[in-house]
């Protein structure tokens, strides 16, 4: 399969464009989300011109977020003629895609087979923030409906397969597979790495667990596993498969084994369809060392609800109507709230981020003691990175504040159990997902002011949304310890890195200092809420003193127009003052309105085509921080940020899942830095939680 990739992409793309061009609503994203549910179930369709085909499902292989092919193919046979509707199958004409639409949870392609048949191909990755049982299932749906559009009956067969490329990032690894039918009528192919490597990755893919590709065991179903050319060719020739299972277990790249279903829909004069499910079952999900007893194997949360993987699969597949309804409820809520808050450009942004963010987390543990672990994705594989959770946290507060609590839980647990030696807040709980083995030597990436501020701010943000003051009391000692660091370092931050570590270290960072000062005032509120009035008075007094001094140290008063600086005294510099957001989020009113007004006047003077640069060191920007900045800006400046980012989504040449770091002039990746599919884009929801 892979050896045909480059040739097929170029040829098949031309075929796709041979018909009328597809429309894209509300935009044509850089990559179109297909099955996007977890760090390992994350398959996309590249669209941007730097390697994508413009967003046409037929003519290009779907890929894992990291870029390698996860073979997924679809064919349709109409009156004995075969067409490709997904993938880059050689020597097969493609359907004509007429439209694409995305919501927060689904991607829908509309296609035509000549003037005879219309197809609707829907990829649904359900998101149920209030239902952890459903959310714990690492599965996604593919729903294919066909309809005669010429008033005539047509004989139609629908085909879809996956390749063994899903089972391992090592294409030389031996794959093994099996076929079965559950007691409740779900037919499935099970595919897995023959030698399981627990808690191991290869090119970011999981090297353990079992993949399931399933459909209903109904009349007209046939199945087959075998070499890609043989199996796809059998369908094209016969309109059905051999009901045979290839037992020659082999390397993924040896004659590319695929696992296929065909459904004969018979003579279709109106409409008919078929449903597929794809997903990953891992009994053991995470290795975690935060508990007092030491390193613990954390089970996937779904294990508490289902006795076997096939039972989970069976439930998921038969749950389609309910899952689709719940997902539509979320789609509709996000749509209404986004449009009411800031219009269509804002919805274009928010709805594209949802699956991406939730696909960075894994639910583990038990219903009585659940945990959420997050993978940083692409920038590195760090786990529960505090300065990644911080920009992401608005989406969790919007969908269900308890989710943020569960993400922060292991961070507190490791430090409160004495497994981290530094007095400031840790950066992450493990160097590479899925191994949350901590940093017992304190040798994690050092961002002391950044992470202390983030943890204090998020503690109060969660408690306010969840009305959970007991949470603040529970963690008061460590929050107070972190605030001591903020008091010592915030007004004159030492030479250190902030969350924007790729930009380098710097002393006296104006925006970083602001985070620390706001963190101190947040602790004053926490102290007051938890019955520590002396601490509250002390922290508030310090924060007010610092913010008054900060307005002298960090503002270029003589500039035209005035603005905050990147670092103290560097009046020719500037940057996004995104840490201002927490003042408004927490209702602190620590920062004078004049600072907000000053920045509102300034930002339009430095806007580039696709947004406002992060700071004066580069022309690139961070989309998450633009959205934090926009959330507390005036209406006109807010809309300026949203319009630029929505335009970027539609025009960027990048061809991977929504990047948060891009060049504001070209829309491309900055030289040498490629961020992909990161959960930080949960920051798109910053406006919706104010």
UniProtKB/Swiss-Prot annotation:
GO biological process: carbohydrate metabolic process
Reaction it catalyzes: L-glutamine + H2O = L-glutamate + NH4(+)
GO-annotated cellular components: extracellular region
Family to which the UniProt record says this protein belongs: Belongs to the fungal glutaminase gtaA family.
Signal sequence extent: 1-20
Description of activity control: Activity is inhibited by about 80% in the presence of 18% sodium chloride.
Pfam families for this protein: DUF5127 (PF17168), GtaA_6_Hairpin (PF16335)
Name listed for the protein in its UniProt record: Glutaminase A
Biotechnology: In the fermentation of soy sauce, the traditional Japanese seasoning, glutaminase is one of the most important enzymes in flavor enhancement as it converts glutamine to glutamic acid.
Keywords of the record: Glycoprotein, Hydrolase, Secreted, Signal
Location of this chain's protein in the cell: Secreted
Species classification: Eukaryota, Fungi, Dikarya, Ascomycota, Pezizomycotina
Record note on pH: Optimum pH is 9.0.
Purpose: Glutaminase catalyzes the hydrolysis of glutamine to glutamic acid and plays a key role in nitrogen metabolism. Catalyzes the hydrolysis not only of L-glutamine but also of D-glutamine.
Residues bearing glycans: 80, 96, 435, 508, 528, 538, 571
Listed EC numbers: 3.5.1.2
Domain of life: Eukaryota
Temperature dependence: Optimum temperature is 37-45 degrees Celsius.
GO molecular function: glutaminase activity
């Amino acid at each position: 399969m892979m050896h045909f990739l480059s040739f097929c992409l170029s040829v098949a793309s031309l075929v796709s464009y041979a018909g009328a061009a597809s429309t894209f609503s509300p935009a044509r994203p850089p990559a179109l989300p297909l099955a996007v549910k977890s760090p390992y179930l994350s398959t996309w369709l590249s669209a941007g011109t730097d390697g994508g085909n413009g967003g046409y499902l037929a003519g290009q292989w779907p890929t894992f977020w990291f870029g390698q092919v996860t073979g997924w193919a679809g064919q349709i046979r109409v009156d004995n003629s075969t067409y490709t509707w997904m993938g880059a199958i050689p020597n097969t004409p493609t359907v004509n895609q007429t439209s694409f639409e995305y919501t927060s949870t689904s991607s829908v392609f509309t296609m035509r087979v000549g003037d005879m048949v219309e197809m609707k191909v829907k990829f649904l990755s359900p998101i149920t923030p209030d239902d952890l049982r459903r959310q714990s299932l690492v599965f996604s749906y593919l729903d294919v409906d066909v309809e005669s559009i010429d008033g005539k009956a047509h004989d139609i067969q629908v085909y879809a397969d996956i390749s063994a490329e899903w089972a391992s990032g090592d294409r030389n690894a031996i794959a093994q597979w099996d076929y079965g039918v559950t007691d409740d009528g779900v037919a499935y192919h099970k595919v897995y790495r023959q030698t399981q490597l627990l808690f191991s990755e290869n090119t970011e893919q999981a090297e353990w667990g079992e993949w399931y590709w399933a459909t209903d065991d109904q009349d007209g179903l046939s199945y087959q596993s075998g070499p890609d050319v043989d199996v796809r060719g059998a369908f094209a020739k016969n309109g059905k498969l051999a009901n045979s299972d290839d037992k020659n277990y082999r390397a993924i790249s040896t004659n590319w084994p695929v696992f296929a279903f065909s459904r004969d829909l018979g003579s279709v004069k109106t409409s008919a369809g078929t449903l597929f499910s794809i997903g990953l079952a891992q009994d053991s999900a995470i290795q975690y060392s935060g508990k007092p007893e030491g390193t613990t194997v954390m089970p996937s949360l779904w294990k508490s609800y289902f006795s076997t993987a096939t039972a989970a699969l069976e439930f998921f597949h038969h749950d389609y109507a309910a899952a689709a309804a719940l997902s539509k409820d979320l789609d509709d809520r996000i749509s209404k709230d986004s449009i009411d808050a800031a219009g269509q450009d804002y919805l274009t942004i928010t709805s594209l981020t949802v699956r991406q963010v939730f696909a960075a987390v894994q639910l583990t543990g038990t219903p009585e003691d659940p945990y959420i672990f997050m993978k940083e994705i692409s920038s590195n594989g760090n786990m529960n990175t505090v300065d990644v959770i911080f920009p992401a946290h608005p989406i969790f507060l919007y969908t269900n504040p308890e989710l943020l609590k569960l993400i922060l839980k292991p961070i507190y647990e490791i430090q409160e159990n004495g497994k981290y030696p530094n007095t400031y807040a840790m950066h992450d709980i493990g160097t590479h997902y899925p191994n949350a083995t901590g940093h017992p030597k304190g040798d994690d990436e050092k961002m002391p002011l950044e992470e202390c501020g983030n943890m204090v701010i998020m503690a109060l943000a969660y408690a306010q949304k969840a009305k959970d003051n007991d949470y603040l009391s529970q963690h008061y000692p460590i929050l107070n310890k972190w605030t001591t660091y903020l008091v010592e370092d915030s007004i004159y931050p030492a030479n250190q890195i902030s969350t924007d570590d790729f930009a380098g270290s710097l002393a006296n960072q104006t925006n970083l200092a602001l985070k620390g000062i706001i963190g101190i005032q947040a602790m004053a509120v926490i102290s007051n809420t938890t019955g520590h009035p002396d601490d509250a008075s002390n922290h508030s007094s310090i924060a007010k003193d610092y913010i008054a001094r900060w307005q002298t140290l960090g503002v270029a008063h003589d500039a035209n127009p005035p603005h905050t600086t990147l670092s103290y005294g560097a009046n020719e510099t500037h940057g996004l003052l995104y840490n201002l957001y927490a003042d408004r989020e927490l209702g602190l009113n620590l920062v004078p309105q004049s600072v907000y007004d000053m920045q509102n006047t300034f930002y339009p003077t430095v806007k580039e085509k696709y947004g406002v640069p992060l700071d004066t060191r580069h022309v690139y920007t961070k989309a998450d921080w633009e959205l934090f900045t926009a959330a507390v800006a005036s209406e006109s400046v807010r809309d300026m940020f949203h319009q630029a980012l929505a335009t970027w989504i539609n025009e960027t040449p990048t061809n991977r899942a929504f990047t948060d770091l891009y060049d504001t002039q070209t829309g491309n990746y900055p030289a040498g830095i490629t961020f992909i599919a990161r959960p930080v884009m949960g920051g798109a929801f910053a406006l919706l939680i104010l």
